């Protein structure tokens, strides 16, 4: 701890960099557009009015299949846009500094392949956070699996891990199977 304090005293620019990162999130402006159906997912995606909770669970909502009745936003990304992608705001501090509180992120509801070590949106169906009553969370997905004699596997434990060390992971066991759903993968922090 003393080494960290000494390093911070020698280099005070860390505070200025932190303030610039916070300002970047606050200055980010969404560009709402009204695309024709054939223009959707070319340079714009739907803005889901879901404030995904990075510290707790969000309001019970569902992510659709791309037929959105929401606002559309133009985004600047190197990614090839496709149906199932959307922008949502992440609130909470558990994923800082990777995802700043209040940041808008690009997500894809089609999570393909392994989820291991990916940042995902998870819905807990059968439970809510006792303090907030919310259901969605954004966390890094880690799982332990067991393989049976017939070659099939099952989850022994899933950890939904925050980036911020001030927060604890959410641990799910095989008893929680069926009550948890990965609904999207976080692709990019937009601002």
What are these regions (language model features)?
Residues 2, 74-76:
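Generic structural signal for alpha-helix starts
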Residues 22-73, 189:
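Extended boundary segments
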């Amino acid at each position: 701890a003393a080494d960290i304090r000494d390093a911070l005293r020698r280099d005070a620019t860390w505070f200025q960099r932190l303030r610039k990162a916070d300002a970047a999130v606050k200055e980010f402006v969404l560009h709402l557009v009204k695309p024709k159906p054939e223009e959707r997912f070319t340079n714009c995606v739907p803005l889901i009015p879901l404030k995904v909770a990075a510290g707790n669970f969000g309001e019970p909502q569902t992510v659709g299949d791309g037929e959105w009745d929401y606002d559309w936003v133009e985004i600047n990304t190197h990614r090839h846009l496709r149906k199932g992608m959307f922008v949502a705001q992440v609130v909470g501090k558990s994923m800082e500094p990777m995802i700043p509180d209040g940041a808008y992120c690009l997500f894809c509801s089609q999570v393909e392949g392994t989820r291991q070590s990916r940042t995902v949106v998870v819905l807990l169906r059968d439970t809510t956070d006792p303090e907030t009553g919310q259901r969605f969370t954004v966390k890094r997905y880690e799982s332990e699996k067991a393989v049976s004699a017939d070659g099939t596997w099952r989850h022994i434990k899933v950890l939904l891990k925050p980036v911020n060390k001030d927060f604890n992971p959410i641990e799910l066991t095989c008893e929680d199977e069926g009550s948890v759903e990965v609904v999207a993968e976080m692709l990019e922090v937009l601002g």
